Every structure is written in structure tokens, then in C-alpha cells.
């Protein structure tokens, strides 16, 4: 079950307050205090809801309210408090005795905002409008600079990766591997035929002929059959 309304809408007055209603509300509060706003209208003989009585008392009828226009000192104090607190009008009103939050809010929107704009100050940030434009341009320039720097870093990283890959990859040799294994094997058929031919001619070609054993690299062998006796 929800909370019951503060008053019956069918039995309450709406609209502007009359002087008679103001006098009744002031007389009751002076005699009994504020008390409970929900029960105050009926006790004071008013056909108003509790919320309407409370706002009427706080904003218009309480004796400590300051009447008249805001002073220059109050304007500067409101500007300073707004730069610190923002749109917290109740807290700002607590620093200005005799002024209500609703009164200060209306005065801000109708007067102080225009005053700040005429000074070239942003009412929201309390900074110079020109400084805000310059700051935005500076941020844009910095963002382009960062983009160029990132692009250069990317190119440098790619180049370094390529160099590292080339260093780690095996170098292909220009010449094939040479088989240096030496083996003693029978001579091919061409060498045998050549040796037999020399034996038949008896080395008459006019040049010294080595036998088969000497051709194998065996020096001073008893099996040497060179015609000039080189092996011996």
C-alpha cells in the first residue's frame, strides 16, 4: 500500500495565494511553529496541501527572507559557489542568508548567465570561451601528431621484424657442398684401357707413363710396372 497523498485534491485550493491565506499561515506558524506540514493546513484552517504551505512559507513568508534585488557581492558569491558546486541550488542558498534556492536558480538563469557571457566566460565551465576554442584546436593538433607518431612506429617495427627474420633465416650457399671423402676404388674402364695401351706401346709416346699402382698414389710399391721405374 503506497503513501497517502498529503491532501484531498477535491478539497484544496490551487493557484495564487490570497492575503487572508498568507495571514493565517503566518499566524499559525508564529503560534505553533512549523511542525508537520501534512497536518498544518487543516490545523491552520487552510484549504491547501502541505507542500503548498511549506513552499509558500519558505519562499515568501518567513521573516528572515531578504527582500529586494541581489547585490553585486551576492552576484560574485553565487558565481564562485556555482563554479565549485554546480547546479546544487540548495547548497548555494545555504551560503546566502535570506535567499532561497528557487530564487537563486531563477536569478542565475535570467541575469547571471547573461553577465558571464558578456564577459566571455562559459557559464557551465567558468572558463574563457576563447581559451576553450584554443584548447580544442590544441587537442586536435596533438591527436594528429600522435597519429603520425604511431604510423612511424609501425613502419619502424615492420622494418625491424624483416631484418630479424633475414638474420634468423639460413643463408643459402652459392656453391654446392663438396664431397671431400677420399675412397680407393678400382679405376674406371677408360683408365684401364689407357694403361693397357701404354703397356703395348712400351711408353713410346715420348712421355713418361705411370702404372696403375702409381696412379692410385701408392709410391715405392713392388707392384709398380712403370716403364721408367718412377715407382721404384
From Swiss-Prot:
One MF term in the entry's GO annotations: DNA binding
Entry coiled-coil feature ranges: none
DNA-binding region: 37-61, 89-112
Pfam families, per the entry: Myb_DNA-binding (PF00249)
Gene3D superfamilies: Homeodomain-like (1.10.10.60)
Keywords, comma-separated and alphabetical: DNA-binding, Nucleus, Repeat, Transcription, Transcription regulation
Tissues of expression: Expressed in roots, stems, leaves, seed pods and flowers.
Keyword Signal: no
HTH myb-type domain sequence ranges: 9-61, 62-116
Subcellular locations according to the entry: Nucleus
Xref: PROSITE patterns: HTH_MYB
Superkingdom of this protein's organism: Eukaryota
Cellular component, GO annotation: nucleus
Main location: nucleus
Function: Transcription factor.
Protein's name according to its UniProt entry: Myb-related protein 308
The species this protein was found in: Antirrhinum majus (Garden snapdragon)
Amino acid at each position: 500500500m503506497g503513501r497517502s497523498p498529503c491532501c484531498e485534491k477535491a478539497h484544496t485550493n490551487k493557484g495564487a495565494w490570497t492575503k487572508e491565506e498568507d495571514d493565517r499561515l503566518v499566524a499559525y506558524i508564529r503560534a505553533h511553529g512549523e511542525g508537520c506540514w501534512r497536518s498544518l493546513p487543516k490545523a491552520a484552517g487552510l484549504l491547501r496541501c502541505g507542500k503548498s504551505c511549506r513552499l509558500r512559507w519558505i519562499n515568501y513568508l518567513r521573516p528572515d527572507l531578504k527582500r529586494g534585488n541581489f547585490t553585486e557581492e551576492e552576484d560574485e558569491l553565487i558565481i564562485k559557489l556555482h563554479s565549485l558546486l554546480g547546479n546544487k541550488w540548495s547548497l548555494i542558498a545555504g551560503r546566502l542568508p535570506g535567499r532561497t534556492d528557487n530564487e537563486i536558480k531563477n536569478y542565475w538563469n535570467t541575469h547571471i548567465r547573461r553577465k558571464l557571457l558578456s564577459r566571455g566566460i562559459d557559464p557551465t565551465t567558468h572558463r574563457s570561451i576563447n581559451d576553450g576554442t584554443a584548447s580544442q584546436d590544441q587537442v586536435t593538433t596533438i591527436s594528429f601528431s600522435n597519429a603520425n607518431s604511431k604510423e612511424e612506429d609501425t613502419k619502424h617495427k615492420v622494418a625491424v621484424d624483416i631484418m630479424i627474420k633475414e638474420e634468423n633465416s639460413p643463408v643459402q650457399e652459392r656453391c654446392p657442398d663438396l664431397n671431400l671423402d677420399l675412397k680407393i676404388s678400382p679405376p674406371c674402364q677408360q683408365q684401364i684401357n689407357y694403361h693397357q695401351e701404354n703397356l703395348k706401346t712400351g711408353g713410346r709416346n715420348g712421355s713418361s707413363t705411370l702404372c696403375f699402382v702409381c696412379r692410385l698414389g701408392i709410391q715405392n710399391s713392388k707392384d709398380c710396372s712403370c716403364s721408367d721405374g718412377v715407382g721404384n
